Structure formats: structure tokens, C-alpha cells
Amino acid sequence: MYHRINTYSYEVLSTIKPVHISEYDWLMDHLPHCKDPAYQKRYRAYWRMNAARLCPAYCTAYFDQLHAAQSRKIPLSALARTLYATPTTRTGKQSLQISFASKLLHMEDPHLPIYDALVRDFYFLTSPSPRQSLNGRINTLYAFYTFLEQEYQRVLTHN
């Protein structure tokens, strides 16, 4: 799988628009200002949080956690539980937003991987059943994330 990616690395990298790199760099450089509404607007657009139609209360809780992550390490499972406690919609619906949680952790430590549907599909992983308990879903996703951390380090170390 990686052999094919390495073979076509130029083509793969050429699909990344320069604006995506400069916006990522700006977000990383200005992370200490994550409580600023202007920063949050750019962050939400970059990480496609607006498409998820998250309610303002969830976004407030999210950026509070992003701010907290700058002074202490937050495990993914704890972050997922904390964010789950805040409804994601105005109607009070809660949902497990592990992708956004992984992006939050990545912002604080860019050596941490990002988990989203594209990554999940690349590795042929399957989402946990919504019939599983919250703890069961978090444990399944945490196992995926641990695998990604190990895989990320393996790729960086061994190409």
C-alpha cells in the first residue's frame, strides 16, 4: 500500500493546494489565540466543523478543550467523553465526534494522527455500531487511534 503511495508521491502531493498548507501553518502558529472568535472561525472552516452543523455550546466546549490541551496532555478517550457530554445540536442530541477530537489533539501535537472517515476507509476499518454503549464505541475508536499512532510512527521511522 505504501509502496504505491511512494511511487506516486509527487502526484499525491500536487493535489494539496498551497492555501491548505498556509492555512494549516497559520492555525498552528496562532494556536495560543484559540479563544479568539476570528481564530475559531478559520479553524472551523479549515477542519470542516461548519459542515457538521455543531451548535454554539459544543463549539464553546471544543475550544475550551483546545485551550486546555495547550497546558496539559488530554487522552483521546477522556476528550471524547468530555465533548460527548455537550450536545452537538440545538435539539440536545449528543454524538461522538472522534474525528474532531483527534484534530484537536493533533493541533497541540502534530506528531499525533488524525482520525476521520478517509483514514478509516484507507485502513478498511469499520465504525463501531451505534448500538454499542458509549464506552464500547470509545474503546473501539481508541483502539483504532492507538493503531494509527503506531502506524504513523512506523511510517515516519521506516518510510
Predicted segment positions?
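An N-terminal alpha-helical hairpin/helix-loop-helix interaction module that forms a charged
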Residues: 1-93, 109-159
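Short, locally clustered residues in the helix-turn-helix/winged-helix DNA-binding domain
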Residues: 106
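Cytochrome P450 catalytic-core helices
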Residues: 103
